[in-house]
Amino acid sequence: MQLMQVQNLSKCYRNGDGVEHLSFSIQRGEIVALLGPNGAGKTTTIRCLTGLYKPDKGDILIEGSPPGDINVQKKVALIPDQPYLYPALTAAEHIQFRARGYHPGKKDVKERVYHALKEVHLEEKANQLCGQLSRGQKQRVVLAGAIVQDALLYILDEPTVGLDIPSKQWLSNWLKTKTDQGCSAFVSTHSLEFVIETADRVILIRDGKLMQDLYVPQFEEQAEWRKEVIRLLGEWSDE
């Protein structure tokens, strides 16, 4: 079942950078990676998908409605490249704040927060200040906030930057678990290694234009494309 449809998405800036005529879709239970070098248009794409930017042209529909629709916003969770947390709040307080924002009046907020912390293996850090957490732990707090939001689509912007190998592996496994539960994920990255380990499909962009949209096994079979992507990225991974 299709969750999101992007048709002829274009967003340009005065300097000419942006994205042009991007078209792709995301199915329920699918992990789609947006792969490209720095400046390819990955962040612009994400900001359009989440409603932060208004496209110059094209359509974005999530379950048949645009990103700005209030019901859509409840179903889409953005995990930014920099985890923005209130340093003076504990991990549990931050998640509780998010839960009350999306589900005002709910009486099971504390229970939701506990289960979310448990799901991201952070229950022991529940009462620790966010300002004292490591980068990987902060990211898990953001993920827990998305869980209590009851998101259907997780949009992650460069999620592996700054993470050690165990944290990257944990994130990969967690995303697969969420999609097994019927959620979907759209991951913007320049880590080819993480894409091959985690994603079902890979969308390659360069200079804001779509180069390829392939299932990962197809991509792995095409040696010439792999070589070209590695050349464009300049490195095998973001470690």
Swiss-Prot record:
This is SkfA peptide export ATP-binding protein SkfE. GO terms for biological process: bacteriocin biosynthetic process. It catalyses: sulfate(out) + ATP + H2O = sulfate(in) + ADP + phosphate + H(+); thiosulfate(out) + ATP + H2O = thiosulfate(in) + ADP + phosphate + H(+). GO terms for cellular component: plasma membrane. It is an enzyme of class 7 (translocase). It comes from the Bacteria. Induction: By Spo0A and PhoP, during nutrient starvation, especially phosphate starvation. Repressed by AbrB during normal growth when nutrients are plentiful, in association with the transcriptional repressor Abh. Its main location: membrane. InterPro entries: AAA+_ATPase, ABC_transporter-like_ATP-bd, ABC_Transporter_VariousFunc, P-loop_NTPase. It is found in: Cell membrane. Belongs to the ABC transporter superfamily. SkfA peptide export (TC 3.A.1.128.1) family. It comes from Bacillus subtilis (strain 168). It is a peripheral membrane protein. Probably part of the ABC transporter SkfEF involved in the export of the bacteriocin SKF. Probably responsible for energy coupling to the transport system. Accelerated cannibalism by skf- cells is seen on solid media but not in liquid media. GO terms for molecular function: ABC-type sulfate transporter activity; ABC-type thiosulfate transporter activity; ATP binding; ATP hydrolysis activity. Disruption phenotype: When the skfA-skfB-skfC-skfE-skfF-skfG-skfH operon is deleted, increased rate of spore formation; a double operon deletion (sdpA-sdpC plus skfA-skfH) makes spores even faster. It holds the Pfam family ABC_tran. Residues 4-232 form the ABC transporter domain.
